[in-house]
């Protein structure tokens, strides 16, 4: 560093302590970056890379962003997984001797973003910490924006990854000694930034006083130490650590959460099209976050589920009160995150006005809930603390429409502070004098166009047009500025009043800022109560959300049994909404004694996967306390749900379709219990026909004989339907479809027994593959059916005399010799089909489009 200027040496010294972050180095009105930071930032932010003299032989790479717009650039970097260290000037440059003192005041990371576009209002922003323990792993979670803290002990790394995926943590704090393979899996499979923390805070941390497990304490302390080191400010809003166990809720593994599209769709990763999208009728950001948490962790205790159901039922039966509640909740801002900003010290006056406006709604909400004709509702109302003292404090202190900045005045009401009132009187009196001065000078000089003005450079002035300069008394005015058509003057008396006014205004701004910080500290004392109130409001919001969606979509209150599944006229909730005005075909599902497994056959795209997902989603909705899309629903409490549905192959990590199938099947087979729900869709499709069939049968037999879980198993292997005669708990069902005028018509009805036809080659005809190719496929199919052997290249002329072993939708006599001539309507449908961008659609959207095309043919 010897050859560099003192400022660059200062930069390098600070940068050495933050090697894993972009260092935003404050220089006047800019944050500057140098050396490799500058090169990389210019690429990531698409800003100009320049250079400057730093004292060495070669110029130093440099780029920068304006201070006032830095947050947008920081958000871009954080979104890409980077960290940003904010280095501020900590002394007045005018008073500095030598290089201005600077230090890092905050390290912003993906897991510690507090506001801005970097976080979604209805999503938590958890940061995770993972530690190796004697019996597995410790996992701690903290959301700086809301103050929530969670911790859990987990045996398997797979479950750790699943939990991190569920909460959407974008940053994971680990020890430098954690196994490298574990760290690599966390980074790659969770898509998170990995941060190392080996220090340990020496302060007394009150939010862990109640913990009695050393592994959990160690894991959370590592996370707390990291937060304290990076944020360099108060963490008073952090709530006591809530310890939970995975077994306290329904476990839904990583694969199943993706396959069932609980919170985002598989292909687009968007909320739209997911169960969360369907259910989200919440009115507050807090309620939206809680709803997602409930979907991620359905309940397994019937009494807890029924408590939610009772409140939902009560709200459904009180339409006007529910609508009033929704309107009031709409006026409640994000109390959790407002409390977090108060604690962090970055709250502004508008935030406190939002807090005030929110608190104004609480008494009405409390009274409304108390009026509901249900004992539990009245008990809930009693627990609501309106925080009236906080409301009174804010109403006394703040103007209704304060500026965004807290250092420009106009924050604090008249009458709140005597000294402030005196300063304001001085300022107002001075301005009144200035206003009178203009009239006096006009009368004295006889210049009607004379005016008194103000600017930040010269202060107050008297402006006279050049045509009237001869009317000014010599020696009375001092020229200050010459304009094209006028001159500006000052007088000793004017400067004297100006000094008094500016001093008063400066005092006002300083005192208002001081009073505002005092107000903020007073509000900080109420944070625990505000957080408790936020919890009450978010629960009410989530429950009214269930009541609203249940009534609007005609859902039914589910009942719970020990072992029986009885779903009458069940509907897939998301598909039903996507279909909108089109008629949805409901289906039954009956499982229980001597009927633990359903083997589902039927044509491709007939609705097998939809039916299976439907049962899983109905079960999840029931266990979060919502009503369900069915005429009647009786369900057991499922402890876990496992799925293998769809073609979400993990090609990026090098895993093929078949490997993904086997991994997901293994996860279910190893971890499922008799109280679990298993959905297997087309197991064995990723390998050869006989291998796939053998594995599918072996999996069915193993689940039947060794696990006994409720299982829905769809297959294209018709040969497996004979298992109904061998396995007492297995029953065949099929999706009904019929042939009409040479076209397959999906009826989407689940019926007892096995399917007897398929239509794979017909789909190829619909896709308008060449006629000779279609004809050749028919020949090959017949040859395979005749030989009963593994697929080989058969002779051209088919000789089929016996009943086909594989499913075929058309009988031999009906096989077209060539592609039939298409009608105008059929051609239009095919053109529409070809124009569909299938890769950009979710499975549900694709199914909906196919249904629309099918309707056009009839």
Curated annotation (Swiss-Prot):
The entry's keywords: ATP-binding, DNA damage, DNA repair, DNA-binding, Nucleotide-binding
Task performed by this protein: This protein is involved in the repair of mismatches in DNA. It is possible that it carries out the mismatch recognition step. This protein has a weak ATPase activity. Overexpression of mutSL partially suppresses the high spontaneous mutation frequency of a ytkD/mutM/mutY triple disruption which lacks the system required to prevent damage by oxidized guanine (8-oxo-dGTP). This suggests that MutSL also functions to repair mismatches due to oxidative stress in both growing and stationary phase cells.
Tagged with keyword DNA damage: yes
GO MF, one example: mismatched DNA binding
Stimuli inducing this protein: Constitutively transcribed during vegetative growth, with a slight increase during stationary phase. Probably part of the mutS-mutL operon.
Originating organism: Bacillus subtilis (strain 168)
UniProt record similarity statement: Belongs to the DNA mismatch repair MutS family.
Gene Ontology annotations of biological process type: mismatch repair
Loss of function: phenotype: Double mutS-mutL deletion strain have 40-60 times greater spontaneous mutation rate. Cells lacking this gene have a 225-fold increased spontaneous mutation frequency. A double mutS/mutL and a triple mutS/mutL/nth disruption have a 200 to 280-fold increased spontaneous mutation frequency.
Entry-linked HAMAP family: MutS
Highest taxon, organism lineage: Bacteria
Residues that coordinate or bind ATP: 602-609
UniProt key word Transcription: no
Chain segments annotated as coiled-coil in the UniProt record: none
This protein's name: DNA mismatch repair protein MutS
Lineage: Bacteria, Bacillati, Bacillota, Bacilli, Bacillales
Pfam families according to UniProt: MutS_I, MutS_II, MutS_III, MutS_IV, MutS_V
SMART domains the record matches: MUTSac, MUTSd
Gene3D superfamilies: 1.10.1420.10, DNA repair protein MutS, domain I, MutS, connector domain, P-loop containing nucleotide triphosphate hydrolases
Cross-referenced InterPro entries: DNA_mismatch_repair_MutS, DNA_mismatch_repair_MutS-lik_N, DNA_mismatch_repair_MutS/MSH, DNA_mismatch_repair_MutS_C, DNA_mismatch_repair_MutS_clamp, DNA_mismatch_repair_MutS_core, DNA_mismatch_repair_MutS_N, DNA_mismatch_repair_MutS_sf
Gene: mutS
Assigned GO CC terms: cytosol
